Amino acid sequence: QALLNIAADSGIAHDEPKSREDWARLMQRVGVKGIHIAERDTQRSKNPKPADVFVNTWSVEGFVSEGLQPAELGWGTHETWMPSNGRRHETGCQAAIYLMQPGANTRVRSWCPTPGAQYGFLVTHNESISIADYFTVGEGRNPKYRPTCHYAYHPANDAVLSLHEMFGAAGVKQAANHILD
């Protein structure tokens, strides 16, 4: 719906998209260069985070696993550069790049309705790749159009403290886990 609204607000006449290709071509016509997915976890604890405990609102093991993966994002055709630590995948749809650094240790500026401007972490989420791939016009390494797409996740404040503690210890996870109620 957002793409249809932008097209209407921009005065771009178009037929109702009926296929993936139609949606991709409309996005190209509208001139969308980036899709930013932002999430903010606002759950908080009644008690301060104890030392050497990784606190999160969902699976600690799952979050740590995702967070230690290389940062990954959909990479648009308008991007004329590549980060010095950026790499392309050898196989797959070619819609993404990854950075040679953990996603949970890669900050990106973000915005969410409730808190406003914030930092998020460039944690790998399949949506950032599948959305970039979905809106691609053309195929392979040199399509005609693809938007950049990334996911910026700001976990609960105690999880942020847990990440700082873990990365401060060279990526060694805390001895104990705690999931907030």
Regions found by a protein language model. Name each.
Residues 7-181:
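C-terminal catalytic/substrate-binding lobe primarily of soluble NAD(P)-dependent oxidoreductases
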Residues 1-2:
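Rossmann-fold NAD(P)-binding glycine/threonine-rich loop
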